[in-house]
Regions:
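N-terminal Rossmann-like dinucleotide-binding module
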Residues: 1-54
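C-terminal helix-rich "cap/oligomerization" subdomain common to oxidoreductases
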Residues: 1-9, 74-76, 229, 300-350
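Beta-loop-alpha module in the N-terminal Rossmann-like domain of NAD(P)-dependent dehydrogenases
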Residues: 54-117
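Hydrophobic residues in well-ordered beta-strands that form the structural core
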Residues: 60, 100, 125-127, 260
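A contiguous active-site-proximal alpha/beta segment in oxidoreductase catalytic domains
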Residues: 82, 105-164
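Rossmann-like dinucleotide-binding domain that binds NAD(P)(H)
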Residues: 168-233, 238-244, 313-316
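NAD(P)-dinucleotide binding in Rossmann-like oxidoreductases
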Residues: 215-219, 229-293, 311
Length: 350
């Protein structure tokens, strides 16, 4: 790129016609000017409707065709949790960069395979923790980095949503469902991102969880107690059958504390409340979508070499912490899908 010439648009291929795609990739691409060059879904009619509604350039017959399409340089994967790992690996094998919805895999073993493959292929692997790119989270980190809150002592992150429909794949063990996979991944990731001010990443001390009625092995809620090397403690809570929506992050230091009212989706509430000995103030950090910041960061990385704050190693570390929470709470880590057809239909879990 020279002078004022804008960077070349990213060429993005979309796997599936999931609802999240409109929020997480379609709207951001409209803002950034990046191209949605191809989409495929298990039902071609759904893919055609998605393309017509959202301006995707071409409809292909299968996920495999999207991954292999020479026009696609970035594969966006918003499929059900259990299909993240297999199709991320397929995209990496085709030398495509990957932007995957979280969690990046069904378990740490699968995440390690993706990390190793991405490293060997030299491709970018970004797990979609979009909140990390927003000024709300950057402000929380800044308050610790500048010492305004003092030494980190306590972190509390709550992720709560009302229950999805009974047939939602987030309740399917075979598709790597559960509250910790859908919501707790944020709670744990937010803790892990505080490692620079906590002496290192946290470990699980204890965890408790409740099983969804009629869904053996699937957690409806899970609370994890964490501890950092520097002595700070944490509470990572998630509930996928709660009352209302709550996505708060509270950071407590020995000089003060700060709470983000909705760190995961600040478009809904961008307040950060800072409490210090001299009083309390509320800062509004802006409701621009987190997903737009994320796509801008990915483009800056791929076009200009700007660093990203997370990579495939981070995705593996987060899955390792998720698996540790499951073990501590008496659950098994999620099984992986053993076979996936060209259109993305799962085989029996392995």
């Amino acid at each position: 790129m020279t002078g004022d010439q804008p960077p070349e648009p990213l060429r993005i291929g979309v796997l599936g016609a999931a609802r999240i795609a409109a929020l997480a990739i379609v709207d951001p691409a409209r803002t950034t000017g990046d191209r949605l060059v191809a989409v495929a879904a298990r039902d071609r009619h759904r893919a055609e409707a998605f393309a017509a509604t959202h301006g995707v350039e071409r409809v292909l017959d299968s996920y495999a065709e999207v991954v292999a399409d020479p026009e696609v340089e970035v594969v966006y994967n918003p499929l059900a949790n259990g299909l993240h790992g297999p199709w991320n690996l397929a995209a990496i094998a085709a030398a495509r960069h990957v932007l995957t919805e979280k969690p990046s895999a069904s378990n740490a073993t699968e995440a390690r395979e993706a990390r190793d493959a991405a490293t060997a292929a030299g491709v970018t692997f970004l797990e979609g923790f979009h909140y990390l790119f927003h000024p709300v989270t950057r402000r929380l980190h800044e308050l610790l980095a500048t010492g305004e809150l003092g030494q980190l002592r306590r972190v509390e992150v709550d992720m709560v949503i009302p229950a999805p429909a009974d047939d939602d794949p987030r309740w399917s063990l075979d598709l790597a469902g559960g509250a910790t996979m859908d919501l707790g991944c944020y709670s744990l990731h937010a803790h892990r991102m505080l490692a620079p001010w906590a002496g290192g990443p946290p470990r699980v001390v204890a965890a408790r969880g409740g099983e969804r009625a009629g869904r053996p092995g699937v957690d409806e809620w899970l609370d994890a107690d964490l501890e950092f090397p520097g002595g700070a403690t944490g509470s990572a809570r998630c509930n996928m059958a709660g009352e209302g929506v709550r996505m708060t992050c509270r950071v407590v230091g020995d000089r003060g504390e700060a709470t983000a009212a909705n760190f995961a989706l600040p478009t809904m509430d961008d307040r950060v409340t800072i409490t210090l000995p001299g009083g309390r103030r509320v800062e509004h950090l802006g409701t621009r979508p987190t997903y737009t910041y994320q796509l801008e960061a990915l483009r800056a990385h791929l076009r200009d070499g700007a660093p990203l704050p997370i990579d495939a190693d981070d995705a593996l570390a987060n899955m390792e912490l998720i698996d540790a929470c499951y073990h501590a709470a008496g659950f098994q880590p999620r099984p992986r899908v053993s076979r996936v057809g060209r259109r993305g239909s799962p085989g029996r879990p392995g």
